[in-house]
């Protein structure tokens, strides 16, 4: 049920925020297709966007460049809009190996994937909210430009139930099977249903805590009620309910039959081409694989790798863009591209990499040519589909500036009064010894240091040198996976070590108020890692500390250094002037280390409270906040097994308590991974 957006915040817009909000809203109301918000680190860009959403009351999609930042934004938006639908849409693969063929070694690699069920449920919840409500904010990663089920077919497949409706039990069960729900009278879990006499219990695929009970009298729906799937306790009775398919890729039977005929036609044409070119092995391989898939589709309605036939299943022509999350966003929706200088190039690069891999599969007879149309959006298709857009970045790229016509909305003043770091340029000759002395000063007063180098070798050597001199130092590099990277950053904030050395990873979105010094070695080596944008982003990591300082080691000042220093000075002067006019004393940010990770804690508690007031709610003290993501995943699996065991033994009180703890652990796990 849609409600108006209601912003929940103890703060009012201040600094540059009111002017930025006014200009963005005016631009949107005047029909501007592209606007850029240049917001410095710590200026409250997310709060500004939340105010724009609340004032204009428009459904919004926020694109983030990676899962880490998406989780951070999801948590912040949840806090700003607790009464509205804030959803999370990222890739649901914990592990994904696409099918590929390496001709040089004649090696075929089968597709292998591990799906995270909780994120799959959140994706289904996101599309349901976009179809049903207007008060929706979906925080998505670049996963949003990949093919998703056709929204028209998805809507056609929905099962609407209303009290008083004439429908027999078999018809309901048949429709549930078409929606890919499985009957399971023993273990009642997401995406299943069970039958007891004239009562059908259905656990919706997009829900994690509420199930539907359908009570029939002869061939009439007598009662619909929502209940807690663990305790069986009725939460409410309702007049109607819509059951959505278990997956985005569900297709009506008649469409599958039609698609199979089209696949057979393409197979015949492709076989002819391969035989004419004397490719007998490829022809045999393609025929065998495709006919097996056709048999599976005929018997079960789906097959492994069915996404490779998505063009036929959605009725598209060759080369047409696939349906994506953008097709679920209303025409008057709003798109916010966070860290746009990274996100926009990412979107542009997805199509070509995917295409190169699939062309090899088609050439060697592993797939039909139509598999090339199972792909992410091309950049020009993304541009055509995108609604009115706000690009958000501290260092907007040329694309965003060009699209906005050079009219940039500035948000340089921080409400906290924090100034941009003081920048010093020092000679390269003594950079390592000078850095060691600076590190010791910072470590003595419990502050942290980030050091960025140009090469992996130099980062390793520097780490070794600092360790030999007794400093607590860690090295962050590209071989470290996302989960471990989060752990290292958390340990730095907790004071497990004082110095973090990296190359190109200490940039966008890293929120570390404890860092008071950023050292950039070889800053005068002009190039990608020492461009104006890279320097500003790296310097910005010290902008959340009241003693923030950046040291650029270089023997000359390059054009990029001059621009970065000039821009930082401009922002610093503007902030200083604002502080003097309003009598503000800069204050450091005391952000708890668990804030980002515990993004769903309060929501989980609220959900639990509504279900059974007599039950004790699991307190945060009982949830191990400092667990690593790998340990969290193991703990979740253990608790799920224990919860089901309690439920089967009819020990509902114990099962419910474990379920409440699982809510917190799952939210922690999403943020951490």
UniProtKB/Swiss-Prot annotation:
Transmembrane segments: none
Location(s) in or outside the cell: Cytoplasm
InterPro entries: Helicase/UvrB_N (IPR006935), Helicase_ATP-bd (IPR014001), Helicase_C-like (IPR001650), P-loop_NTPase (IPR027417), UVR_dom (IPR001943), UVR_dom_sf (IPR036876), UvrB (IPR004807), UvrB_inter (IPR041471)
Disulfide bridge partners, by residue number: none
Family annotation (SUPFAM superfamilies): C-terminal UvrC-binding domain of UvrB, P-loop containing nucleoside triphosphate hydrolases
Ranges spanned by the short sequence motif Beta-hairpin, renumbered to the chain: 92-115
All copies of domain UVR, residue ranges: 633-668
CDD domains: DEXHc_UvrB (cd17916), SF2_C_UvrB (cd18790)
Predominant location: cytoplasm
GO biological process: nucleotide-excision repair; SOS response
Keyword Protein biosynthesis belongs to the record: no
Keyword set includes Membrane: no
Gene3D superfamilies hit by this protein: P-loop containing nucleotide triphosphate hydrolases (3.40.50.300), UVR domain (4.10.860.10)
Region called Disordered, residue ranges: 608-627
Domain Helicase ATP-binding positions: 26-183
PROSITE patterns noted in UniProt: HELICASE_ATP_BIND_1, HELICASE_CTER, UVR
Family that this chain belongs to: Belongs to the UvrB family.
PANTHER family found in the cross-reference section: UVRABC SYSTEM PROTEIN B
Subunit description: Forms a heterotetramer with UvrA during the search for lesions. Interacts with UvrC in an incision complex.
Function: The UvrABC repair system catalyzes the recognition and processing of DNA lesions. A damage recognition complex composed of 2 UvrA and 2 UvrB subunits scans DNA for abnormalities. Upon binding of the UvrA(2)B(2) complex to a putative damaged site, the DNA wraps around one UvrB monomer. DNA wrap is dependent on ATP binding by UvrB and probably causes local melting of the DNA helix, facilitating insertion of UvrB beta-hairpin between the DNA strands. Then UvrB probes one DNA strand for the presence of a lesion.
Record's protein name: UvrABC system protein B
Species: Escherichia coli O81 (strain ED1a)
